[in-house]
């Protein structure tokens, strides 16, 4: 499965966060891939390795527990991709200006590759908002699923929102 996220701040801010040591499990944060506003794709964590993109979470009732002190999560079996938030989204509001054409183009290419490499059903692409069991996450805000679906369809893949 794939969980879509947003950075909330700039790409460089996200990278600085990932470079800061977080020794406690509950403080871990990372994504497999980041997509900048210009469409640049940054691969950060090997897709075969675990990224820490979603805390207390489940997808279709599934989760895994690796630390008995923490609640279950999809992190052990999910790929995490985050899009850089536009400057208007550097706040806690429910929406922002949205993502760029370049981001949707790059997102579709990355997802199409993952769909084919990992034999993922397109219906296994979801958002952080939809897997978050704590009700604290609403990302990616201002995400237009139809823009992604159009691009995946053009690549021969379909995505069910």
Feature-to-residue mapping (PLM):
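N-terminal catalytic cores of peptidoglycan-degrading enzymes
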Residues: 1-72
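Basic/polar, cationic surfaces and motifs that engage anionic cell-wall
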Residues: 76-80, 84-161
